Amino acid sequence: MQVNENPNKVPVELNRTSLYLGLLSVLVLGILFSSYFFN
């Protein structure tokens, strides 16, 4: 069971990084659009 848990943890970390990257890109896009609309 322990040997099976380790390979499962790696994809979870990759998914977390991709999720954080997606949130970051959405935040940047939101800031850009908000500044564009405010201007």
From Swiss-Prot:
It is a single-pass membrane protein. Keywords: Membrane, Photosynthesis, Photosystem II, Reaction center, Thylakoid, Transmembrane, Transmembrane helix. GO terms for biological process: photosynthesis. The chain crosses the membrane at residues 18-38. It comes from the Bacteria. GO terms for cellular component: photosystem II reaction center; plasma membrane-derived thylakoid membrane. It is found in: Cellular thylakoid membrane. The keyword Transmembrane applies. Coiled coil: none annotated. InterPro entries: PSII_PsbL, PSII_PsbL_sf. PSII is composed of 1 copy each of membrane proteins PsbA, PsbB, PsbC, PsbD, PsbE, PsbF, PsbH, PsbI, PsbJ, PsbK, PsbL, PsbM, PsbT, PsbX, PsbY, Psb30/Ycf12, peripheral proteins PsbO, CyanoQ (PsbQ), PsbU, PsbV and a large number of cofactors. It forms dimeric complexes. One of the components of the core complex of photosystem II (PSII). PSII is a light-driven water:plastoquinone oxidoreductase that uses light energy to abstract electrons from H(2)O, generating O(2) and a proton gradient subsequently used for ATP formation. It consists of a core antenna complex that captures photons, and an electron transfer chain that converts photonic excitation into a charge separation. This subunit is found at the monomer-monomer interface and is required for correct PSII assembly and/or dimerization. Belongs to the PsbL family. This is Photosystem II reaction center protein L.
